[in-house]
A protein has these predicted regions:
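RNA pseudouridine synthases
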Residues: 1-257
């Protein structure tokens, strides 16, 4: 019973209307139950829709404290709006479904993710199953004892390893960033630094391994695009013409990051 999860027995009895004069209270308890069931059905529908559109996340490693999950492109790492279904909700559902956590456990601990990826970026996200796992993994990312690398395919030929610098300003209304070579707008711009390593290349395309020295919103996508090497399939910062060519020829509809 959903209500019992949140109240002690004596409080629940009062709430549910165990006393003789319980008609009003009992009706309210029934309304709460109906409301909780309605919310649950809504969440399930949203989850099914996300899985249908993006694919289901895949747990690729698990021990007693952490999960490593392959997040599909199109899925949020964390919810942006109340009704979103993100990777955070998936982690809770996964641990409930596998019996690692119970609904009672979730009253005192909410599993979370230790790193985030943009919605349209696929890749590995670490999650904590326990407080210790969450703290240790988060600290490893923060202190850079654990390194993150991104793989992407960009337009044009890059044959030398390089580190590029610049400044980034985000427009929250359009959810888009602009890159500058020098600081702009009275100090509003944030410094960015991106390292890339060519893995292989042709005259028209390059497979890059990217290391974010700073971690700003949309940094890889916007920084590479500002240098004339936009990520293939990136509808926000890439070339519409080139994206259309790859979509028609190779059926690529997601960004190659």
């Amino acid at each position: 019973d959903v209500v019992k999860l949140f109240f002690a027995d004596d409080t629940y009895n009062k709430f549910a209307g165990v006393s003789e004069s319980n008609n009003i209270t009992d009706n309210r308890a029934n309304d709460v139950n109906k409301g909780q069931k309605s919310i649950s059905k809504t969440n399930e529908a949203i989850k099914r829709k996300v899985f249908k559109e993006c694919g289901k996340p895949e747990v690729i490693f698990e021990d007693d404290n952490i999960l490593l999950i392959n997040k599909p492109s199109g899925m949020l790492s964390q919810k942006a709006e109340q009704n979103d279904y993100s990777l955070v909700e998936y982690v809770s559902d996964y641990l409930l479904d596998t019996g690692y956590l119970s609904e009672k456990d979730l009253q005192t601990f909410h599993p979370g993710i230790c790193n985030r990826l943009d919605r349209n970026t696929s890749g590995i996200v670490a999650a904590g199953k326990t407080i210790m796992g969450l703290q240790n993994m988060s600290n490893a990312f923060k202190e850079r004892t654990l390194h993150k690398y991104y793989i992407c395919i960009v337009q044009g030929k890059l044959d030398k390893r390089a580190t590029i610098k610049g400044y980034l300003i985000k427009d929250n209304k359009s959810n888009k960033v602009s890159i500058y070579n020098k600081e702009e707008k009275n100090g509003e711009a944030l410094p960015i630094e991106t390292e890339y390593i060519p893995v292989c290349y042709t005259d028209k395309l390059t497979l890059l391994k990217v290391n974010l020295i700073t971690g700003r919103s949309h940094q890889i996508r916007a920084h590479l695009a500002s240098c004339g090497h936009a990520i293939i399939g990136d509808t926000k910062y890439g070339s519409r013409r080139i994206n259309e060519i790859f979509k028609k020829k190779y059926n690529i509809s997601n960004q190659m990051l």
